[in-house]
UniProtKB/Swiss-Prot annotation:
Gene Ontology MF terms: ATP binding; NEDD8 conjugating enzyme activity; NEDD8 transferase activity; ubiquitin-protein transferase activity
Pathway: Protein modification; protein neddylation
First-level EC class: transferase
Family the entry assigns: Belongs to the ubiquitin-conjugating enzyme family. UBC12 subfamily.
Entry GO CC: cytosol; nucleus
Species: Xenopus laevis (African clawed frog)
Alphabetical list of SUPFAM superfamilies matching this protein: UBC-like
Listed name of the protein: NEDD8-conjugating enzyme Ubc12
GO terms, biological process: protein modification process; protein neddylation
Post-translational modification N-acetylmethionine, affected residues: 1
Amino acid sequence: MIKLFSLKQQKKEEESAGGTKGSSKKASAAQLRIQKDITELNLPKTCEIEFSDHDDLLNFKLVICPDEGFYKGGKFVFSFKVGQGYPHDPPKVKCETMVYHPNIDLEGNVCLNILREDWKPVLTINSIIYGLQYLFLEPNPEDPLNKEAAEVLQNNRRLFEQNVQRSMRGGYIGSTYFERCLK
């Protein structure tokens, strides 16, 4: 009995020290769930996922290339960082492409309700991808992070469209310079 206890204790110590001595490391709940989400992905033709490390499913990039709307022809890259609290906590999503958009600020923060107060563990990576794609089809000036872009969208849709096109071609809007992001 004592020998069994000491073997269990030794195994615990090895695992906490990072040694696995013949046994493989167990996947966390977040890793299992993200693996399931990735396996069940049903990406629209305008979206693509890129993994820089195929062994790390918790960090990846999403590329959205809208084929209609204000942002048609653009290429927008988002980084996803899935924490160990997933699916109880939403992933951290940032837009890496500087974009003139009411719901994405100039630092890349994204205003999407399912990434904040409306997140539920039943939502998946697929839900977030469709939510992000929808932001490009229907920007929401009612819940803005970029208040200036939201105001222009509400008051002068034509000017908003011109600003979006100028920003995607690469150019200034006011004093802010946008890198070219056309495909």
